[in-house]
């Protein structure tokens, strides 16, 4: 059973089609990251799965429960941290989390200790005396995701969980999301930050213009770019031109260029398999390898490869 499954899912806003027949699945117990620019359909998909929006057509299920015909049951087994932090303006963080814990059915005897621990984990404890309206943007966002760490649902939705949060805060939230997954929750994260996607994802689905373009692990997505790995070599041997010719014949090589007499640059697929073969070949040709530097494709490169545009450009 999939934790999430959509079939031919569409959502129409007037003349704009946000989702265009989306077929999408999430395995139980994984972190699935939706990577795409603003307007790609990420938030629309999340809001449908959270039962906030109804699809125009198609079906969507969470833990085999239909989000339209059994929406109450879906809300009982899932939780959502929204893109924009939500809270009662004149309430304090503990009051907001206490209210959330109550409506989620967390026993009264467990609430206070759980809320205190989550607030300390997210470095919100020192802000416990502030009103929501006086929290900084980063504090408000951490409070929004804190709701799910208090609730700990079977299916957790995070819409851009670290927007407005500094790097230290991002890492704290990422670690807590991993912890939630390790405890058995299935997690769906929407983001346009490649570093966040790479850090969190068990698998990534690239969304563009309401469609799923590709879905796989980070490693396989990067390996799918032919010649995407760049290997820079410093060598010492009798004939650099000859070694360029020989390296060009190795399996996985797309192109080898001599930068100067001793420095080569190779564009290869799957550098982790190519480098050992390269060193063995150089040894056979009496050429010493003095240094090796490998640069792999970024997720922005992956997005560019599959959509024809840069994620950074598409997001602006």
Question: Where are each of the predicted segments found?
Answer:
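Helix-to-loop junction immediately C-terminal to a conserved catalytic motif
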Residues: 50
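Conserved ABC transporter NBD signature motif
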Residues: 58-66, 73-74
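Conserved ABC ATPase signature
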Residues: 131-135
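Catalytic Walker B motif of ABC-type/P-loop ATPase nucleotide-binding domains
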Residues: 156-159
């Amino acid at each position: 059973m999939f934790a999430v499954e959509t079939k031919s899912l569409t959502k129409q806003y007037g003349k704009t089609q946000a989702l265009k027949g989306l077929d999408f699945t999430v395995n139980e117990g994984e972190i699935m990251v939706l990577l795409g620019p603003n307007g790609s359909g990420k938030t629309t998909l999340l809001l449908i799965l959270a039962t906030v929006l109804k699809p125009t057509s198609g079906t969507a299920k969470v833990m085999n429960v239909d989000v339209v015909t059994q929406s109450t049951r879906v809300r009982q087994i899932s939780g959502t941290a929204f893109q924009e932090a939500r809270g009662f303006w004149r309430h304090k963080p503990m009051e907001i989390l206490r209210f959330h814990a109550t409506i989620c059915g967390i026993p009264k005897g467990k609430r206070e200790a759980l809320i205190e621990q989550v607030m300390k984990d997210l470095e919100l404890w020192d802000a416990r005396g502030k009103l929501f309206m006086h929290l900084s943007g980063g504090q408000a966002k951490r409070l929004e995701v804190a709701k799910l760490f208090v609730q700990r649902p079977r299916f957790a939705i995070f819409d851009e969980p670290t927007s407005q949060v500094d790097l230290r805060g991002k890492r704290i939230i990422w670690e807590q999301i991993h912890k939630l997954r390790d405890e058995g929750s299935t997690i769906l994260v929407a983001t346009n930050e490649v570093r966040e996607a790479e850090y969190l994802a068990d698998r990534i689905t690239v969304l563009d213009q309401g469609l799923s373009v590709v879905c796989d692990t980070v490693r396989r997505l990067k390996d799918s770019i032919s010649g995407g790995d760049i290997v820079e070599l410093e060598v010492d041997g009798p004939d650099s031109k000859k070694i360029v010719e020989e390296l060009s014949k190795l399996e996985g090589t797309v192109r080898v260029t001599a930068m100067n007499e001793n420095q080569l640059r190779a564009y290869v697929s799957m550098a982790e398999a190519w480098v050992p073969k390269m060193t063995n070949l150089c040894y056979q040709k009496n050429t010493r390898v003095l240094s090796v530097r490998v640069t792999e494709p970024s997720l922005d490169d992956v997005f560019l490869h599959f959509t024809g545009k840069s994620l950074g450009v598409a997001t602006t």
